[in-house]
């Protein structure tokens, strides 16, 4: 497929501080040969998404095959997180898969997604994850993609089972 998705929202207009956190994400990205997953955990409204977007926009040159972005609605007011199958349908669509070629089964969708991104250098930003089970089907199978996950929770399953680098975030203090 020749589709190159560019799904990142605009970078935060005013992003300040968090230099250490940006450096930590840089260090994660520089571990060649591993899928980089940074579970940025912390309370609501402290800048997880802004940090992820600010970092991502600084590294667009490292992901020439595009970016995929989704708000997983892990802390949505109506309490209904986005199902992985729905996310995979939108990712496959963005990658140029025709609607009638998208499998109905979650595992088949995940396998097709992994196949399509296996050799690509892409960024996959999974924002506002509720738990590891929601994220796992959305992970690439190879080591060429960079994955950044934000969540209000630590997601220990992502760290333990998938080698994610956890980056905790605290409220910024005035400097």
What label would you give each PLM region?
Residues 1-127, 143-151, 162-173:
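Walker A/P-loop phosphate-binding element recognition
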Residues 129-137, 142, 158-161:
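Conserved ATPase-coupling elements of RecA-like P-loop NTPase cores
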Residues 154-157, 175:
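Short gly/pro/ser/thr-enriched loop/turn and capping motifs at secondary-structure boundaries
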């Amino acid at each position: 497929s020749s589709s190159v998705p560019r799904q990142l929202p605009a970078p935060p207009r005013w992003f300040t501080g968090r230099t250490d956190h940006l450096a930590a994400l840089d260090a994660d990205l520089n571990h060649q040969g591993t899928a980089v997953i940074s579970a940025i955990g912390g309370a609501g409204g402290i800048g997880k998404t802004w940090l992820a977007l600010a970092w991502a926009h600084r590294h667009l040159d490292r992901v020439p095959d595009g970016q995929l972005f989704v708000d997983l609605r892990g802390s949505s007011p109506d309490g209904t997180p986005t199902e992985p199958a729905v996310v995979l349908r939108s990712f496959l669509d963005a990658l140029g898969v025709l609607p009638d070629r998208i499998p109905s089964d979650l595992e088949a969708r995940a396998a097709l997604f992994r196949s399509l991104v296996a050799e690509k250098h892409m960024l996959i930003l999974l924002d506002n994850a509720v738990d590891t089970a929601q994220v796992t089907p959305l992970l690439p199978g190879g080591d060429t993609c960079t994955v950044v996950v934000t969540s209000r929770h630590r997601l220990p399953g992502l760290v333990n089972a998938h080698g994610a680098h956890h980056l905790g975030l605290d409220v910024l203090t005035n400097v």
